[in-house]
Amino acid sequence: MERHCLFFVIFSLILHLVQAQDPIGFINLDCGLSIQGSPYKESSTGLTYTSDDGFVQSGKIGKITKELESLYKKPERTLRYFPDGVRNCFSLNVTRGTKYLIKPTFLYGNYDGRNVIPDFDLYIGPNMWITVNTDNTIKEILHVSKSNTLQVCLVKTGTSIPYINTLELRPLADDIYTNESGSLNYLFRVYYSNLKGYIEYPDDVHDRIWKQILPYQDWQILTTNLQINVSNDYDLPQRVMKTAVTPIKASTTTMEFPWNLEPPTSQFYLFLHFAELQSLQANETREFNVVLNGNVTFKSYSPKFLEMQTVYSTAPKQCDGGKCLLQLVKTSRSTLPPLINAMEAYTVLDFPQIETNVDEVIAIKNIQSTYGLSKTTWQGDPCVPKKFLWDGLNCNNSDDSTPPIITSLNLSSSGLTGIIVLTIQNLANLQELDLSNNNLSGGVPEFLADMKSLLVINLSGNNLSGVVPQKLIEKKMLKLNIEGNPKLNCTVESCVNKDEEGGRQIKSMTIPIVASIGSVVAFTVALMIFCVVRKNNPSNDEAPTSCMLPADSRSSEPTIVTKNKKFTYAEVLTMTNNFQKILGKGGFGIVYYGSVNGTEQVAVKMLSHSSAQGYKQFKAEVELLLRVHHKNLVGLVGYCEEGDKLALIYEYMANGDLDEHMSGKRGGSILNWGTRLKIALEAAQGLEYLHNGCKPLMVHRDVKTTNILLNEHFDTKLADFGLSRSFPIEGETHVSTVVAGTIGYLDPEYYRTNWLTEKSDVYSFGVVLLVMITNQPVIDQNREKRHIAEWVGGMLTKGDIKSITDPNLLGDYNSGSVWKAVELAMSCMNPSSMTRPTMSQVVFELKECLASESSREVSMTFGTEVAPMAR
């Protein structure tokens, strides 16, 4: 290890000394050059080239064929090719805010003997630059670096293998090649001469390559041996400016220079370089207008004798159909025709993808370096573009105007050794950290408790020792797993936190848990005991068990097995008074008001013949509700199954559904914050029961505001179980199923994988909670952030809870409880289902929110009492 470090220091010193001999800031990489052959001075330019070995972590070395070597310069004879991975990147240290001319060279040279030129893409950082599909080409771009590290990436787009021969960077002055936005991609750079050949460094101090153009037949080349004053920052070579082209006949009025743009809609910048090479007599004048696409861009211009001037537009231009025409048009007072020495054109490339937060990039690279991680995908920008996201990372980049942030780091089973490094705390937005199944030693660092966004920490399967920091144990909404660390001291006493009432909340350190979950665990255990007792003593209760749901309840039998609570169609007609009063309409059909025996009010949902829901879902809902009973699940009074006449008969919910109240469709008073929290809590309890109280567990699959019903006392009941699914195998964590649900509420992970878990309901509930907080539509096509979660996420960056809270509440709420509810909703909607809370945890947190709001209301009531007047 020491030998490697010493070698790196020596190599760095050599590189520094070598580069000091070149113009300041020049980077010259000979890709594929061995360390032993580095550095060397290229004979024609005098520039010093070094191996690319320290600038890229992947790739193999190749050489062009022997017969071609004599035709090319030494840097172009070797190459680096990338058979492995999709994106392979060079990482270069640069100066942030500096404009660079970036020049990679690609000379295939049949290095692989296949004689097939590869096709691949080139990226600058996270943004696509250009496709490389030709042999012996140099690509150029003028680009301002947004950080102190510049990454040039080769991306495989098919079966062919990307390669590169040289990579060169040249810093430029800020006040040349100015543009409004974006980067400038090389289109052409020409000068006019009778002598063939290119002009480059050292003639051009910026190492631009100038291509010679022969004049047209009716044009001539002017030359001079005198020195040209080229000190206008563009610093064109003397050889370029000592020649110019002009019409042979003085009477010629116009010089034309056509070219085509690809794609035709491209914007471009044009830079024209002039210097008068003839000493004009007193009676001679050279004056002309610069006309681009028929528009005069510079009027009555006269080049100065032996002094270079550059004419350019400050705004980008476009050409009709991509066909461009530059004209130099002689003015009426001019005695001589126009002339021009050189011109350049660059197309505008907008790079819309913002690089990942600089501090977090530095942090993750330090982590990579410290642990010696050599993951194939860990190259380029960690988060963007999304298709190249680093393995083990999740990022939040929903807002295009702000840098992406790292939200999850999974280094499980990565062979990590040593301690948990302090650098991790610089990932300030990290929500999930998984360092499990490594060989980490030392203690559990206290800084983990100070990371405000952190919700999940998995340190299981390591060799950690010492005591778990109390701050970490006491942190709320944190899942902590330290299982499999035999040297770690976490006794029951050290892992206990006292609640406000002096009760003990045991936090199991061997499974992921949420802070302050004791009461919910107790409730769940009590419920299970209750269910077992009732199962073992069926004679104690005539009703079916409210906890056990048979595994075959989703059988494909043609009729419903249970005959209890079955009504005839004639009875349905009677109870609805021939379907007199409509309560609502949905995808299932029409819902009518009715009464049983003239006393019990009911809602009768008739299955439409055109319903997409169908008999299967009708049957599923009946069999579920006949067996499952909970105060927060809508009660099934009965059903009708008579030929094609299918009806579900529910208990009547006088106050309709939550959506009607949030949208104002129902009229009446606005639901205050306390009532909303009560509704959310009761709906959550209904879901918690489906997930934990039923065996096998049930997943609702269609949790939304229209399926949350309210009775006359605003008690809440979850409804519409037609899409519900059970997990028939005990211990099964998911089922694979066709995606079903409502757009906007649908779990993206479930949609993507077809794997249904109870966490899919948790996601949907998070959406419901955001709707209750904000009173915003779930999907709004007129909103920049169309989905409610994106909109809330963007607003939260401002730190003002009022900006997202329903204005109808008029600020009448405890801001702490609103913040807690928002945080809970966002955690429910975490992209990774593993990091979402369970419904038990959601219930507990909502109870705390409601308690906080209730105590505020009580204190306000006391605060309005008349106080005694001072005497």
UniProtKB/Swiss-Prot annotation:
Residue numbers carrying Phosphoserine: 736
Record PTM Phosphothreonine, positions in chain: 568, 737, 742
Each LRR repeat, start to end: 405-426, 429-449, 453-474
GO MF term set: ATP binding; protein serine kinase activity; protein serine/threonine kinase activity
Catalytic activity: L-seryl-[protein] + ATP = O-phospho-L-seryl-[protein] + ADP + H(+); L-threonyl-[protein] + ATP = O-phospho-L-threonyl-[protein] + ADP + H(+)
Record membrane topology: Single-pass type I membrane protein
Annotated ranges, domain Protein kinase: 577-850
EC number: 2.7.11.1
Active site: 702
Name assigned to this protein: Probable LRR receptor-like serine/threonine-protein kinase At1g51810
